[in-house]
């Protein structure tokens, strides 16, 4: 895959598109001249051109005829614009172009209806894709040939670890869990950073402790294939009790419990709010996680 000239045309210039651009170009060394962006906002297109050395334009007739892969990378609030945008480029799309959607909640059936006769697939990645530490999955359309799947695998594995799924229903479940855990993990880290600062630690030290602890827990559980209680990491009751007392004092236990006990419909509603919030935050400061206002 790396040895092939592989043009990728993105429809959409928001956060979803930039996650891919940043990771593939800056972290994985993919050539910028293989990336093209079609967006509605001229200033945003100019920003992406300068930032990633790609070509970007508001002219939806440009670049499409060069595409090996067309990536639907439209942010959630703009999903309703997709049919009109596709209509502008339909007669320019190469007949063998792969249609690849990273737009949340846009079903395979909708993609196949917009691009009849084309191989189609959906990809899902979490926000850690920006550092190449994501976990993601994909599903393919009914008529999509198997020889196109390496493209999806390549894109996901460039940004993290691939999870195999059987169908779109399982794809949706995996995606929901990934984003729900993303939200709860960031909230938990935020809680611990704020508590550490209240206890008198510097913000830099607080952040280092919180992030390294979460990283270490993940690695330990993955390598041991155990849950925390089987690993017997709570054997020191005095230390454990002190930790729980600290959590109770600052209301952290209640906050984290509420997150993890959310029913599915609440998780989905929160995901939509999180995506919209991420988009708004992204407009202020690209890829800078602000834990404190």
Please provide the spans of the model-predicted regions.
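Short alpha-helical
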Residues: 15, 43-44, 77-80, 106, ...
